[in-house]
Amino acid sequence: MMSYGYQQTPIVAPPAKFQALWFYSFYTQIQHQQLHEMSAWFRSIDKDRSGSISAMELQHLHVGYGPLGIETATKLIRVFDVDKSGQIDFYEYAALHQFINILYANFLANDRNRSGTIDAQEIHRALGTSGFNLPFNTVNLLFLKASPRGYGLKFSDFLGLCASIAIARSLFEAHDRMRTGVAHLNVNHIYDIISLV
């Protein structure tokens, strides 16, 4: 008997090196059906069928407020690009997509007055529930850098801020192989981190 129904492409488990990364936990939170939907979107945007996408392709992803845009897409690629090729494969993309979903949910949950923006206190809470436990003083400095007048951050600004924090985390963890929270960095490593964040 023939079946004419839609067949989902099987999703293979990610490679072991991917499973050792801090953002693998985002991948593990994705439901099976969501994973197939993400796979379909990924394949539709991967025009050259290379199995990876660039910031130019990723910028078209719509998240709550509209497309990511090239600047945010570039930052997010830097976070999730394990092999530093300037592109992400499907597993990296799926973790990135879930990262954005979690940030968006936490943004909405902390925008208690529904103004469409969040202040430093709300950002601190949203970051904590998103897995970034930073001291409030650091969050306040980041907030004032992103919003010099202190009006609050829209989701697009919050996502860019989180991407910058995640880049710093990824770069730091490259030097903290034992995951102790301590790394030996020289001044050139610091310059690298500053230039990429």
Curated annotation (Swiss-Prot):
Family: Belongs to the Peflin/Sorcin family.
Keyword Repeat: yes
Assigned keywords, A-Z: Calcium, Cytoplasm, Membrane, Metal-binding, Repeat
Species of the source: Dictyostelium discoideum
Protein residues bound to Ca(2+) 3: D111, N113, S115, T117, E122
Protein name, UniProt field: Penta-EF hand domain-containing protein 1
Predominant place of localization: cytoplasm
Membrane-topology annotation of the record: Peripheral membrane protein
Family matches, as Gene3D superfamilies: EF-hand
Biological processes per GO annotation: response to bacterium; response to wounding
Domain EF-hand: 33-67, 68-103, 111-133
Entries under SUPFAM superfamilies matching the protein: EF-hand
Positions annotated to bind Ca(2+) 1: D46, D48, S50, S52, E57
InterPro entries per record: EF-hand-dom_pair (IPR011992), EF_Hand_1_Ca_BS (IPR018247), EF_hand_dom (IPR002048), Peflin/Sorcin_CaBP (IPR051426)
Assembly and interaction partners: Homodimer; in presence of Ca(2+). May form heterodimers with pefB.
Encoding gene, per UniProt annotation: pefA
Localization per Swiss-Prot or TrEMBL: Cytoplasm; Membrane
GO cellular component: cytoplasm; membrane; phagocytic vesicle
Regions annotated as coiled coil: none
Statement: the UniProt record of this protein carries the keyword Transcription regulation: no
One matching Pfam family: EF-hand_7
Superkingdom: Eukaryota
Outcome of gene disruption: Cells lacking pefA and mutants lacking both pefA and pefB grow normally in axenic medium or on bacterial lawns, and have no major differentiation defect.
Binding positions for Ca(2+) 2 per the UniProt entry: D81, D83, S85, Q87, E92
